[in-house]
Amino acid sequence: MPGMVSKNPDLEFDSLQPCFYPDEDDFYLCGPDSAPPGEDIWKKFELLPTPPLSPSRPAPGAPSGRGPGAVGRSGSVGLPHDPVDWASELLLLPPEADLWGGMDGGDFFETGPGVTNNLNSIIIQDCMWSGFSAREKLERAVTEKLQNKTPAAPPPPPGTAGSPPVPARSGRAVPECVDPAVVFPFPVNKREAPAAEGLRRRRRARGDSRASSSSSSSGDDTLSDSEDDEDEEEEDEEEEIDVVTVEKRRSSTNKSVTTLTITVRPNNTTFSSVRTQQNGLILKRCAPIHQQHNYAAPSPFVETEESPPQKKLKVEVSRPVKPTIQPKLKSSSPRNSDSEDSERRRNHNILERQRANDLRSSFLTLRDHVLSELVQNEKAAKVVILKKATEYVHSLQAEEQKLLLEKEKLQARQEQLLKKIDYKRTC
């Protein structure tokens, strides 16, 4: 931020001036090259004052000291006399103090002598918190600055009427800060920082004890103790777990596998053989788990190795049988098929010739014996012969009908004659 202001001082310095103290470069006691740029930025965020137009909160000691019209730009709002005092009030307080004014602690903005404040209330556990290293460096710088400035600051004279007392001076910084309940209404866990510190100390102690136990114990003892340390290894897997074992454990989360994961640093050469043996054990024990999760694949390795030879034997047994039977069938079937085809062709040709001869002879008979008109016409077409034959058939049918009628008449006449003969005999 100072670099940005120095690049464009005419345009941006006036708008950004309320966000910085006038002597912040002297306050931090460090140049741009003394610390990494990230930590310098986080320090500025830690000590960033409240924006000018934020809602005011009067101190309990001076309720009518400042009116609402007094809160304006940074020129109208009075800054504390010493920014080092303001930073020390924020940083050099016990971490057990409650931000929201709990039962055992005071308020964050009550800067009385017997009131405790929470260190986490600076940014309310913001995600951009720089960490413990930056906090320790900042506390060290603040303490050194306080030791240097405390003898130089003259005490205010008691007789002057314009100089306010000490609690009033500390209370003047209250309207410049925002009530966290207005901006961030969610409750903050009171024991977050001590719990986090205790958890990290516990993890470090566990890592030290685990390293010492792994150096003293052998591979078999560590295999028996691996089930008890599985939960602890999951907590420290970012620092102490091998890559191969992480992948195997993720794949085998459903089934408990007694595997050992020892973190061996490259300087230690005594546990290299133990680590290789453990890696071999892990690979051997986790391999069937992949097969069990894959339901389509055959379950064990031994059965899969034995089953393909059986299939090959079956195929090899069936293959020799087919070539022995098929050549005989092929050798016999072509000859039989050829002979049968030749016989069928011969029979078919003979039958076709006989049919053609019969048809020709029938046409010739029709032409010569039935159709007297076409006897001398040897080149008459079959169609003409068939037409003439049909006409002849129809004529024959007509004659048949006539003859039948005559027959009926004759039979009726015969009956009449027979009746007459019988009548005459009787008479």
From Swiss-Prot:
Q: Residue positions of the PTM Phosphoserine?
A: 224, 226
Q: Name one Pfam family in it.
A: HLH
Q: Where is the composition biased (Low complexity)?
A: 210-221
Compartment list? Nucleus
Q: Where is the composition biased (Acidic residues)?
A: 222-242
**GO annotations of cellular component type:** nucleus
Q: Which SMART domains match?
A: HLH
| Chain intervals with Pro residues compositional bias | 49-61, 152-167
The record places domain bHLH at 343-396
What domain of life?
Eukaryota
The reply to whether Phosphoprotein figures as a keyword in the UniProt entry is yes
Which UniProt keyword terms apply here?
A: DNA-binding, Nucleus, Phosphoprotein, Proto-oncogene
Instruction: Enumerate the residue ranges of region (Disordered).
Output: 45-79, 144-173, 195-255, 297-349
Which molecular function GO terms apply here?
DNA binding; DNA-binding transcription factor activity; protein dimerization activity
Region annotation (Leucine-zipper) ranges: 396-417
Tell me, how does this one assemble?
A: Efficient DNA binding requires dimerization with another bHLH protein. Binds DNA as a heterodimer with MAX.
Q: Which PANTHER family match?
A: MYC PROTO-ONCOGENE
Q: What is this protein called?
A: N-myc proto-oncogene protein
